[in-house]
Curated annotation (Swiss-Prot):
Stored HAMAP family: AnhMurNAc_kinase
Family: Belongs to the anhydro-N-acetylmuramic acid kinase family.
Role of this protein: Catalyzes the specific phosphorylation of 1,6-anhydro-N-acetylmuramic acid (anhMurNAc) with the simultaneous cleavage of the 1,6-anhydro ring, generating MurNAc-6-P. Is required for the utilization of anhMurNAc either imported from the medium or derived from its own cell wall murein, and thus plays a role in cell wall recycling.
Pathway connected to this protein: Amino-sugar metabolism; 1,6-anhydro-N-acetylmuramate degradation; Cell wall biogenesis; peptidoglycan recycling
Annotated organism of origin: Synechococcus sp. (strain WH7803)
Protein's recorded name: Anhydro-N-acetylmuramic acid kinase
GO terms for MF: ATP binding; kinase activity; phosphotransferase activity, alcohol group as acceptor
Entry binding sites for ATP: 9-16
InterPro entries named among the record's database cross-references: Anhydro_N_Ac-Mur_kinase (IPR005338), ATPase_NBD (IPR043129)
Amino acid sequence: MRVLGLMSGTSADGVDAALAQFHGRPEAPHWDLLNTASVPYPSALKERLIRMAQGEPTRACDVLEMSEAVTEIQAAAAHLCDPEQSASLLGCHGQTMWHRPPVPSGESSRESGRRGASWQMLQAPLLAHLSGRPVIHDFRAADLALGGQGAPLVPMADAALMGRIDGWRGLLNLGGIANITLIPPNAGPDRQHPVLGWDCGPANTLMDLAMTRLSGGQDTFDLDGALAGRGTVCEETLERWLQEPYFLSSPPKSTGREVFGQDDLNRRLQQLAPHSAANQLATLTAFSAAVVAQDLRRLTATGQPQPVELLVAGGGCRNQTLMRQLRRRCLGVRVRPSSDLNLPTQFREALVFALLAWWHQRGHPGNAPAITGAAKATVLGLRVNPA
């Protein structure tokens, strides 16, 4: 079955599309990536989405206008990737505007026991009409309804797509947020261990916001990590950041721009104010690597497995300074781009949502309670047919 996957991440750069063929057993499918395409968001739309996602009050009419624009760009990406409409199904994540993980009962907080919720902006019926095929969307809702985090959703798909090796294998996505998947080995005492996954913390969110500010709006990201590469990391400040509650908490956990956004950047840049722009960006870049390395060290310290390799995808893998920091801090782990194994770094998540849509069609669960904390595994997504 041919399925088209669409993904627009936390960085709100635009829409990535992946056309794939799936067949065989859902848990271990045979697959081929047939085509990929990207359509960027216009800069004005990107800015409006980011401001709203960081809590800026927005008129209802403007929300409607943005959701129409986002949906139309999703449809444009679908057409560019599959102009002959060979796919019979479309899986679309939508644009995350707010993600609110659940708060366990018993926590010393006024929000103790609060259920989780998440909003992915999309007009699914319009997308089904514009693309001329059924759309599977709202993938997080069922997991959240079962008490889960609703994220990350990629680990089970990662395990199905990449398969197993002799040791633990890690897949790290460096989008706006850094999320990691750990796949158990194909033999040995850990072979029955469940797949693991969680959100480590910020990847590109803080770096991109900082670059926009430091460049006076001329640059929205640090190309190849060039400016950060000229700076020196403020290790003392970095170590303080790593002691913040989110980074000391254990999975299941998920996060987003609502936590690591403009307000968070303002606080961190105030602490780095005496330092040069290059040093500030170097420290933020190292921070994105350090949150991953700290999580892996904690696994080892508690007797959990450490991956023998870490395959990196997402826009952050094009940041050479960030990749160097990962290799430096993830000691004993081979760090390399996922493209080394023919999984395009930019389109991994689009491929994942194509697979999740296929799983929905097959009635196969897409989440994992060990990862999200949901009460049970369940089929993800809602289906909308063309009118």
